């Protein structure tokens, strides 16, 4: 996956371990871009922020609510510039949705439905019972990072780690930040007051094949041209 970048920037230093990069280049870099697996986002981001480096971290920002709260506190205490890689937030479509709603062009919004075709990787699986040979191109210990060190299995790589709770956040964690961003921003939603969830068979190691989540958000302060009532 990195070959195109390596070919374009042949003189750039390359590292397997982000910690070694921080040790060797910490004094010569201003910021970092983090696009590793979900379960390593928080620890790499936290180390960078503690060093005073600005951070652009791919979505989902973290692997858990605790990690998100930790990074929020670090951002406030360090004062570094941070951004999450939610590319749709920078597009014209998001701005147009906000403009339409804030101008009252579609009236009060009381219900929003969002859907995705994800997962496009396997989910709803039991944990593998056997170990496979680790590919020569993969440092399994480094990939595992802060997660539990499971025996390597081909079900995890490439790409499919997204459906396994030790490494990924399932379809909801992978896509909700994209498809829910517009209503969150346009309707000025905060924290929900009620959350209900249902899914196909729940397993301890892997995300379900399908799920439905319902959230209720309280009314917000009205805007000049539109009211912001409770939203489902």
Name each model feature, range by range.
Residues 54-56, 61-142:
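A contiguous active-site-proximal alpha/beta segment in oxidoreductase catalytic domains
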Residues 1-57, 62, 66-81:
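N-terminal glycine-/serine-/threonine-rich beta1-alpha1-beta2 phosphate-ribose binding loop
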């Amino acid at each position: 996956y990195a070959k195109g970048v390596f070919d374009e920037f042949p003189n750039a230093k390359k590292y397997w371990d982000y910690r070694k990069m921080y040790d060797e280049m910490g004094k010569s870099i201003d910021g970092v871009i983090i696009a590793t697996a979900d379960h390593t986002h928080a620890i790499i981001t936290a180390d960078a922020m503690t060093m005073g480096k600005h951070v652009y971290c791919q979505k989902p920002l973290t692997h858990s609510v605790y990690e998100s709260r930790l990074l929020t506190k670090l951002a406030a205490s360090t004062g570094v510039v941070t951004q999450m890689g939610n590319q749709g937030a920078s597009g014209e479509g998001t701005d147009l949705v906000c403009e339409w709603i804030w101008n009252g062009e579609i009236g009060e919004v009381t219900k929003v439905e969002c859907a995705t075709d994800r997962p496009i990787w396997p989910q709803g699986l039991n944990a593998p019972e056997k170990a496979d040979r680790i590919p020569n191109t993969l440092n399994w210990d480094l990939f595992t990072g802060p997660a539990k060190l499971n025996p390597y299995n081909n079900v995890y790589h490439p790409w499919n780690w997204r459906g396994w709770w030790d490494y990924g956040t399932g379809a909801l964690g992978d896509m909700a930040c994209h498809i829910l961003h517009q209503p969150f921003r346009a309707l000025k939603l905060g924290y929900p007051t009620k959350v209900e969830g249902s899914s196909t068979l729940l397993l301890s190691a892997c995300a379900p094949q399908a799920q439905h989540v319902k959230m209720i958000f309280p009314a917000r302060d009205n805007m000049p041209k539109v009211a912001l009532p409770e939203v489902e």
